[in-house]
Amino acid sequence: MYQRVLLKVSGEVFGGTKGGLDYEAITEVAKQIADANELNINIGVVVGGGNIIRGIDADRFGVLRTTADYMGMLATVINSLALQSVLEEKFGIHTRVQSAIPIASVAENFIRRRAIRHLEKGRIVIFAAGTGNPYFSTDTAAVLRAIEINADIMLKATKVDGVYDKDPKKNSEAVKYDEVSYREVLDKQLKIADSTAIALCMENHLPMMVLDIFVPGNVKNAILGKKVGTLICECKK
C-alpha cells in the first residue's frame, strides 16, 4: 500500500457532461478521495482547469498565451475551492488549499514544508494554480508537487481507463497497456500527459498510474496496490 500519493484530477472530469462545474461529478471525485482517506495515508490533490478554460485553447482566439495560462491557473483555484467545500461539508474531511500564485483571501501560499506538515496531520492538501508559471501544464505541476512532497506515486484520474497504443475513441483495435515505460510513452508519443511531465517522472523515478475516476473504488484500489488502469514506470523486464 502506498503511504503518500498525489492525485491529479483533470478539469474535464469536474465538468461532467455539461462543462463548467458539475457538482455530481465533483461529489463523485470527493467520495473516491474520502474512501481513500479511510486508509489513513497522506493525500495531495491537483485539479486541472479545462472544464472552465484551457490556456492553450484561449491562445487561438487572440488571447495572449501567457494571459491565457494565468486564466487557466485561476480556473484551477475555482475547482480546488469547489472540491475543498465538498470534502469538508459533505464528508467532514479537513483540507487545505495551497496556491502557487498569491491569493491570500481564499488559499494559503504554497510552502513545501507547510504542505508536508498538513499531510502529516492527516489533512488533504489541494494544490492550486499549477506551477504558478505560464507554459507549464497542470500535469507537470502535479508531477512537481508529487516530487516535492515525496509522494510514492502519482495517480492521474481521467475519464479513460488507462493508456492505449492508439486513441480508443477513433480506433476499435486500440490495445490497452497494463504497464508501460516512461521511455515508450515518450518514444511513441502516447497522448496521456505532456512530455515534460513524463520526463520529470522518469528523471525522479516517480511512477504514474492512469485510471478512470468514475469507476467506484478505483482510487482506493490503486493505493492498495491492486491492478487498476495503466502503470507508467521504469518497468524493467
Language model: regions and residue ranges:
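C-terminal catalytic "cap/lid" subdomain
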Residues: 1-237
